[in-house]
């Protein structure tokens, strides 16, 4: 009896699979892992597989930005229309995340990952073959966004949180960093492919490679997470006394403000991320330099995401949001007066270092100020708002370029949206301090 408490769990075995029934299908879920699997080597190995899957599944978000100048020239469309594949992809990503999360809960995460592999793989291949601009856009939104990327973000983050207790925060941060790792790796790889074999062949190769690799990795994710009681909130994340009046506002008003804040910060964030390659091309530096800047930006974003998580544990979600918003605004301002090659590299690095912690801070804010029973739905809603912001901002920047002939107005537009985000964060901070003062001054009721 005592030995089972000391048995080290190393992963699913053949007997596990036999008990599950191999006739259920190659990607059918295995039974839940034992509780000894939590924080184990098997969990660490699963986290590594998760990181690979998110890095592969998120590639389309960044490859589409790299090929934008070639797509615009090939299809003979405007810069705004060339931005629409990214816009539709992000909208599909946001909607699909909720659908794939529901599928993962019912059928196991491997099922959603297989659909993701099919979506990313077929999306790349069909987009590379089509000669219709609107079909090209719809493929990005439906196959690559709705089915593909969505399967490798929210479901993987949720799954990771169930395999860790002591190191849950850093595990989730590592998992979420796969999205930025994709941004650090794929732009340069895609640009090399575009320069050597063209964007269409690059898409075909990415499609075949992604489909096969993601499907094989999904086989390693069939084990259901250990069954355990609801987790205890992390230290320093206690809810406010009256969770029905977050920030001294109604829950609907407070949530609506966070939704708009998420939208606004990502409209601003999307300008450099979506258009830096095209911007460098227009300045005469070439698409390759722009791809390098995008990779640098997102490599620094990985560092930013991890460091911001540690900062958030110390100062809370709302202050982390304000800090990130101020710094992101400073980075956007640096793009206005400087357009030299070295200056753009520096501005890209600073932008990556400054903005990585903004989006994760919304989850902490909701955990700190709203009822825990509503956390899942509210976090999902605000994260979707950030994706809508990325989609809207990518299109708006392209449209402003078409209207003005440069990206100067697009950067100013991004700064304006960033100010809206900061204004909401400051307002919520003021409302929270005021509600706490009123609570302290109110007479105690016997």
Question: What are these model-predicted stretches?
Answer:
Residues 45-79, 100, 186-187, 272-277:
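Extracytoplasmic
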Residues 64-68, 252-306:
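Extracytoplasmic gate region of multi-pass secondary transporters
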Residues 95-133, 312:
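Conserved MFS/SLC helix-loop-helix module at the cytosolic interface between two early adjacent transmembrane helices
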Residues 135-150, 263, 343-356:
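Hydrophobic core of transmembrane alpha-helices in multi-pass small-molecule transporters
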Residues 140-177:
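Cytoplasmic helix-loop-helix junction between adjacent transmembrane helices
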Residues 179-225:
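Helix-loop-helix hairpin linking two adjacent transmembrane segments in secondary transporters
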Residues 183, 369-404:
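A late C-terminal transmembrane helix in Major Facilitator Superfamily
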Residues 297-301, 307, 312-365:
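C-terminal transmembrane helical hairpin of 12-TM major facilitator-type secondary transporters
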């Amino acid at each position: 009896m005592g030995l089972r408490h000391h048995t080290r769990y190393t992963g699913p075995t053949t007997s596990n699979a036999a008990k599950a029934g191999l006739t259920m299908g190659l990607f059918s879920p295995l039974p839940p892992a034992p509780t000894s699997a939590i924080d184990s080597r098997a969990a660490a190995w699963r986290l590594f597989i998760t990181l690979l899957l998110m890095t592969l599944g998120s590639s389309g978000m960044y490859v589409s930005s790299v090929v934008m100048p070639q797509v615009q020239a090939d299809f003979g469309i405007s810069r705004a229309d060339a931005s629409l594949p990214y816009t539709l992809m992000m909208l599909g990503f946001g909607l699909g995340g909720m659908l794939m999360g529901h599928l993962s809960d019912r059928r196991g995460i491997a099922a959603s990952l297989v659909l993701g592999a099919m979506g990313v793989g077929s999306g790349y291949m069909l987009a590379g073959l089509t000669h219709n601009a609107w079909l090209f856009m719809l493929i990005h939104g439906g196959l690559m966004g709705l089915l593909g990327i969505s399967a490798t973000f929210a479901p993987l983050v949720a799954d990771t949180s169930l395999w860790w207790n002591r190191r849950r925060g850093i595990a989730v941060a590592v998992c979420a960093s796969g999205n930025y790792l994709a941004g650090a790796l794929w732009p340069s790889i895609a640009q090399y492919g575009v320069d050597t074999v063209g964007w269409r062949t690059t898409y075909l190769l990415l499609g075949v490679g992604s489909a096969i690799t993601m499907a094989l990795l999904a086989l390693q994710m069939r084990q259901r997470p250990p069954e355990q009681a609801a987790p205890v909130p992390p230290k320093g994340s206690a809810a406010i006394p009256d969770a029905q009046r977050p920030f001294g506002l109604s829950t609907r008003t407070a949530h609506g403000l966070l939704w708009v804040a998420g939208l606004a910060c990502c409209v601003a964030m999307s300008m450099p991320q979506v258009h830096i390659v095209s911007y460098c091309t227009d300045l005469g530096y070439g698409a390759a330099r722009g791809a390098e800047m995008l990779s640098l930006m997102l490599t620094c974003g990985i560092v930013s995401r991890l460091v911001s998580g540690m900062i958030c544990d110390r100062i809370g979600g709302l202050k982390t949001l304000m800090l990130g918003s101020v710094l992101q605004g400073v980075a956007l301002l640096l793009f206005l007066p400087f357009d030299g090659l070295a200056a753009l590299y520096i501005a890209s690095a600073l932008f990556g270092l400054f903005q990585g912690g903004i989006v994760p801070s919304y989850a902490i804010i909701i955990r700190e100020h709203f009822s825990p029973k509503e956390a899942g739905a509210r976090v999902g809603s605000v994260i979707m708002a950030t994706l809508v912001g990325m989609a809207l901002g990518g299109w708006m920047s392209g449209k402003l370029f078409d209207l003005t002939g440069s990206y100067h107005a697009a950067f100013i537009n991004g700064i304006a949206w960033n100010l809206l985000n900061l204004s909401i964060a400051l307002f919520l901070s003021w409302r929270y301090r005021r509600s706490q003062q009123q609570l302290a001054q109110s007479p105690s009721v016997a």
